[in-house]
Structure formats: structure tokens, C-alpha cells
């Protein structure tokens, strides 16, 4: 499986990957998804262009579509392996 890391300034590459139906792992900082640090999966885009997530600690957050820019804003600013976004496939 190919995995490519992207930083927040490469958000357009991440959005393009979602448009290609690729999964994206994201390390989040405190905000809507976590109080400390937390991984979520971006599963794709809904019909309105919002992001559908898989949040292992919240079924409720997994059933809501999210604004892509909110996710980018709350993603970790410092992450190893070229993160905080990792595109799978």
C-alpha cells in the first residue's frame, strides 16, 4: 500500500486525493475532534463537497459531514513523516 504524507500547506493535494476516493489519515490537534491529539480517517466527500470522516472515538462525529478547511485548521501543525495528512493508495 502506498502512503504519501502531506502538510497543511499541501491541502489542495489532500482534497484532490479525496476527490479520487482515496482514504486520508489525519492527526488532529485540540478542537472539534479532540481535547489533546487524535487520529481520524477522511473517508471521502459528500454531495455538497464536505468531508465524511471515520472518528474511532465518536460515532456521532462520524455521522456528520465536515468543512474541509476546519479539518485543515485543526490538523496538527507539527507531525513526523511529512504529516499531519497521509493519503493511502
Where are these regions (language model features)?
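Active-site-adjacent substructure of cysteine-protease-like catalytic cores
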Residues: 2-58
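Noncatalytic regulatory segments and standalone regulatory/sensor domains
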Residues: 19, 23, 45-89
Amino acid at each position: 500500500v502506498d502512503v504519501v504524507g502531506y502538510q497543511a500547506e499541501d491541502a489542495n493535494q489532500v482534497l484532490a486525493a479525496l476527490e479520487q476516493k482515496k482514504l486520508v489519515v489525519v492527526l488532529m490537534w485540540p478542537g472539534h475532534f479532540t481535547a489533546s491529539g487524535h487520529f481520524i480517517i477522511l473517508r471521502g466527500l459528500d454531495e455538497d463537497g464536505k468531508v465524511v470522516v471515520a472518528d474511532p472515538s465518536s460515532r456521532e462525529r462520524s455521522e456528520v459531514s465536515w468543512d474541509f478547511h476546519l479539518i485543515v485548521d485543526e490538523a496538527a501543525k507539527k507531525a513526523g513523516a511529512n504529516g499531519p495528512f497521509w493519503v493511502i493508495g
